[in-house]
Design a protein with these regions (language model features):
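Long, well-ordered, tryptophan-enriched scaffold segments
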Residues: 239-245
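Transmembrane and membrane-interface helices of multi-pass
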Residues: 2-6, 10-227, 244, 253
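Helix-hairpin-helix/helix-loop-helix acidic hairpins
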Residues: 230-232, 255
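Beta-strand elements within well-structured catalytic alpha/beta cores of enzymes
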Residues: 247, 254-259
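Intrinsically disordered, low-complexity N-terminal segments that are enriched in acidic
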Residues: 233-234, 238
């Protein structure tokens, strides 16, 4: 029997889940994040031409989350997987509500500003938007609900060897590199995925082209390491342009008039 990542306890003992459960555990979060991204983008009516970008990044992030829920005891694995699944699904729903009410998505860096704006003053509007958004919120939460109800029977949440979790992290790295390759393909337009990946502005375009989860990850990254390329960097030298009539001081013959 091939190595499936589970700890062996006694020779000849049969793994309770087998290869199918192993694959289900590994692919649980990649499948969930791809589902959430596709449902999110279809509902928000974004350009699906960028789906290859955020699908690959979703798979990479999914492998990372799967690795976090593999090497612990059964109860800890189960609790971690269910909490992560519900939390991430709620984040997608919350961003839809934020876009509906505030006409923009909100990353972690904007939470302080949002708190300062006393959002409680808009509690009625928020409550109304949440009620109207219940159908899409339930669709987003559906996989997490099924995981909470039937996850123990379907995937088992058995403890896997730490080395196997390391292999899953390796898959995360491979797909992340693949995602960077897709980002740097020759996409059309002024704001391409490659440019948006380096920015800390244009969050709506980032969400559309890079995906919601990648945008939020980049927002956290840029809170620690400031972005090098923003929209403002294209115009930072405008203030150094010479005003009318100052060209004569530059030594340009065209700027001087002989008397």
């Amino acid at each position: 029997m091939g190595y499936n990542g589970k700890r062996s306890r006694g020779s000849g003992r049969r793994d309770d889940g087998g290869l199918n459960r192993t694959m289900a555990r590994v692919l649980l979060f990649p499948a969930l994040l791809v589902y959430l991204e596709l449902v999110f983008h279809i509902y928000m009516k974004t350009a699906l031409v960028y789906a290859p970008v955020y699908v690959v990044f979703a798979i990479a992030a999914g492998f990372f989350l799967s690795a976090l829920t593999l090497p612990w005891r059964r109860q800890a694995n189960s609790l971690a997987a269910k909490i992560l699944a519900v939390l991430i699904s709620v984040i997608y729903g919350a961003e839809i509500i934020a876009k509906t009410i505030l006409q923009s998505y909100y990353g972690p860096s904007a939470l302080k500003m949002a708190a300062g704006n006393k959002l409680t003053d808009y509690s009625d509007v928020i409550a109304s938007a949440v009620v109207r958004g219940i159908p899409i919120i339930l669709i987003l939460l559906l996989p997490s609900i099924l995981l909470c109800l039937f996850g123990g029977r379907l995937v088992g949440f058995a403890r896997f060897d730490l080395r196997f979790a390391g292999l899953v992290l390796g898959a995360c790295v491979v797909f992340h590199i693949l995602g960077l390759g897709v980002v740097h393909l020759p996409w059309k337009g002024d704001l391409t995925p490659a440019k948006l990946y380096q920015m800390d502005t244009n969050i709506d375009d980032q969400v559309e082209q890079l995906g919601l989860l990648t945008t939020l990850r980049l927002d956290v990254k840029h809170m620690i390491v400031p972005a090098k390329n923003t929209m403002g960097s294209d115009f930072e030298d405008i203030g150094n342009l010479a005003p009318n009539g100052s060209s004569s001081s530059s030594g340009d013959p065209a700027g001087s008039v002989s008397e």
